[in-house]
Amino acid sequence: MKFVSMKSRGGDYLVVAENVAWLRTHENGQTQVGIVGSTPNLVAGTIEETAATILAG
């Protein structure tokens, strides 16, 4: 299981990379991260930056 650290304006998340289902652009330069079996997390950064963070793990 690989955890990825994601920055958020309200606090940081440790997300299991394998549980990321989708990414969606949100307002103010943020991205929604869809999590399998959960509600989406709102993280700081563009969709490209978020994808790169997940892939770099």
What are these regions (language model features)?
Residues 1-57:
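Acidic, Ser/Thr- and proline-rich intrinsically disordered linker/docking segments
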